[in-house]
């Protein structure tokens, strides 16, 4: 249920008001975006989440709640509470592995997601690319970065192949291997976009795994694999710029050195793929 409040609650206020019988169990700090914590009462568990980006508008957090509210429970956690700066969702029991599942299994999950009703808001990358440029450390802004940004602005985003609801942050740490199948967590970047954009954004281990994932998806979607791969490749410069810009943005926000290393690595990939 959504709950409106002008003043954000503290963690203790949240628990005492809405979950008085629950107690915190553990904190999750995995991933690049931040942490959440687990609460429990008599075997029932919920995950309590906060916005990963403290500077993002509250509307972005609300969109995540709305996305989870309309997704089937077989692929995503069901939300139970939304209010300013807090969201409470089901805990998904299962294993989070350090590597991606079989490409055919992952393709099946993504294809099923892409058959769901659209969320109602579009993913547009150019505003994000420009935001990350503006909000990055001025000392890190380069002529090459600006040149690539102008090039993409002039080229415009690739034409859509198929418009579907997307997760947009598919990597091993966001996949729960449950008894009933694969499920996705961390839906903060979800929105409607090109299916090829989703496939391009998957954090794969190598090009062979990426090609196999696209081929397996193409079989399910009844698309020529070569056609789908070409569309995926069209999104590569956009995705690499998005990742590099996000890492730069997070570096300025947090001062965490891991973001500088990741940004530098992504810039190198971008040069290779140009």
Curated annotation (Swiss-Prot):
Keyword Nucleotide-binding listed? The answer is yes
Enzyme class per UniProt? transferase
SUPFAM superfamilies this protein is in?
Protein kinase-like (PK-like)
From the UniProt record, give the pathway where this protein acts: Cofactor biosynthesis; thiamine diphosphate biosynthesis; thiamine phosphate from thiamine: step 1/1
Keywords of the record: ATP-binding, Kinase, Nucleotide-binding, Transferase
Give the GO molecular function terms.
Answer: ATP binding; thiamine kinase activity
Known EC number: 2.7.1.89
- Provide the reaction this enzyme catalyses: thiamine + ATP = thiamine phosphate + ADP + H(+)
- Report the Pfam families cross-referenced here: APH
GO BP terms, alphabetized: thiamine diphosphate biosynthetic process; thiamine metabolic process
Task: Please verify whether the record's keywords include Cytoplasm.
Answer: no
What this chain does, per the entry, is described as:
Catalyzes the ATP-dependent phosphorylation of thiamine to thiamine phosphate. Is involved in thiamine salvage.
Q: Read off the HAMAP family from this record.
A: Thiamine_kinase
The entry sums up its family as follows: Belongs to the thiamine kinase family.
Q: What is this protein called?
A: Thiamine kinase
Q: Which organism is it from?
A: Escherichia coli O1:K1 / APEC
Q: What is the lineage of its organism?
A: Bacteria, Pseudomonadati, Pseudomonadota, Gammaproteobacteria, Enterobacterales
